[in-house]
Amino acid sequence: MREQLEALRDEALQLVNQASTQKELNDVRVKYLGKKGPITEVLRGMGKLSAEERPVVGEIANAVRSVIQTELEQRLVDVKQQEMDAKLALEAIDVTLPGRPKQVGQAHLLQQVTDEIEDIFVGLGYTIAEGPEVEQDLFNFEMLNLPKDHPARDMQDSFYITDEILMRTHTSPVQARTMLASKGEPIRILCPGKVYRRDEDDATHSHQFMQVEGLVVGEEISMADLKGTLEAFVKQMFGEAREIRLRPSFFPFTEPSVEVDVSCFKCGGKGCNICKQTGWIEILGAGMVHPHVLEMAEYDSTKMSGFAFGMGIERIAMLKYGVDDIRHFYTNDVRFSEQF
């Protein structure tokens, strides 16, 4: 019996050493140590042995079982390590290879310019005001001194939904709403947003574009305050070397009204193709709030005055970044957008 058990031990240990996978090791364990294995059979048959043989055979069988189990466990550790080494070698990454950069999204140029304009005016004490894009005729026209027969109300110029509802043509309705809600108190607001007009799309016009308007109402507000505000804005937006000039103009909601020009970025005022040899580039319209507008918003025009200004965000972006076609902003061409 001793020789038989030792032969089983040697046979099992040989197979253990030859095994190269966890499955092969498990097969050896089942074959020799399983419920139907030869060593288990020996232990089960000990009842047939004499009293003198039983302890001797039991000791030998348990020793053989222990040796095989120990070798299986040790070999299993080695096989697992070998399998891991092989897997790592197969999946090895060369850390010296150049990485693959991931494209990261960013704010659209119009959003960047809007944020910059807002930051400038918030720094001057303004608050941001917003309103609906689908607007009442009352706020879009009537409260801005644009009576029913005014040319700007022509159906060809505006997107009307009903006789009294339209897509706003400017962000001025936000000013009217804010003045009404302020109940005669001083205000200083900036109104950015989308506006809509019945324009043919071309290099400089779009049926939808972005506008930002500013409004200040208070006691003893003067044209000098307007000029100083716009000078501060232009220098922060376009550089300290820029100057502005005011030209007389007409807007129904301001009196007096002005067009505001900035000294040319390219030639510094000497004259070039960008400024059409004038040395100046038009950037926005402005003026003192018309007394009728103040009165319709329930302000006392004998005590309160104010100024307003408005500019196209696309135009500011085109001038600052040298964009030659407004349609570039809306074509979703990554080659254009990623430049900014």
Swiss-Prot record:
GO molecular function, one term: transferase activity
Chief location of this protein within or outside the cell: cytoplasm
Catalysed reaction equations from the record: tRNA(Phe) + L-phenylalanine + ATP = L-phenylalanyl-tRNA(Phe) + AMP + diphosphate + H(+)
Record family assignment: Belongs to the class-II aminoacyl-tRNA synthetase family. Phe-tRNA synthetase alpha subunit type 1 subfamily.
Positions annotated to bind Mg(2+): 255
E.C. designation(s): 6.1.1.20
Assembly: Tetramer of two alpha and two beta subunits.
Cofactor: Mg(2+)
InterPro entries (alphabetical): aa-tRNA-synth_II (IPR006195), aa-tRNA-synth_II/BPL/LPL (IPR045864), Phe-tRNA-synth_IIc_asu (IPR004529), Phe-tRNA_ligase_II_N (IPR004188), Phe_tRNA_ligase_alpha1_bac (IPR022911), Phenylalanyl-tRNA_Synthase (IPR002319), tRNA-bd_arm (IPR010978)
Binding note for cofactor: Binds 2 magnesium ions per tetramer.
Keywords for this protein: Aminoacyl-tRNA synthetase, ATP-binding, Cytoplasm, Ligase, Magnesium, Metal-binding, Nucleotide-binding, Protein biosynthesis
Organism: Exiguobacterium sibiricum (strain DSM 17290 / CCUG 55495 / CIP 109462 / JCM 13490 / 255-15)
Subcellular location: Cytoplasm
Coiled-coil residues: none
GO annotation, biological process: phenylalanyl-tRNA aminoacylation
Cellular component GO terms held in the UniProt record: cytoplasm
Pfam families: Phe_tRNA-synt_N, tRNA-synt_2d
Gene: pheS
Protein name per its UniProtKB record: Phenylalanine--tRNA ligase alpha subunit
